[in-house]
């Protein structure tokens, strides 16, 4: 029980459930990779896949559950937030596109994450769209020194730094996702 009397799910922890079975894990097993670009791209890909894995098997209610009151943080909110982060760094900063934010209010990615299947589908569709754009942009960039052109308030930033930032962004939020998922149904690891 929590301090406010809410039931806490039994922790699903053990060596048997700590890691995904290799045949069920879409992430890379590790390098060596063929260079800096491939290393960064694969690490980012694996962090994105980890987010998907942390959300797998949950319905709209589970994805939208704010598991750590009074925070608005939820797994669905993280998906929406990371779609915005992808859009900002790859479409706006790197590609220089003038696009409207997916969620205009500063905290709307989190506060608008409601337990509605249509909201869930829209969030995943938006995230997939932004990830696909980012992957195309990176694949077509001549090298990692390509400079972002879309943020006049910021010094030009090379693609290399954006990729490192995105790995960090996903790693941070995947840590949140670990705790949120454990609070929802006791699932840990993976």
Q: How should each PLM-predicted stretch be described?
A:
Residues 109-146, 160-166:
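Acidic/histidine-rich alpha-helical segments that form the ligand environment
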Residues 27-40, 112-118, 122:
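Short, charged, low-complexity loops and linkers
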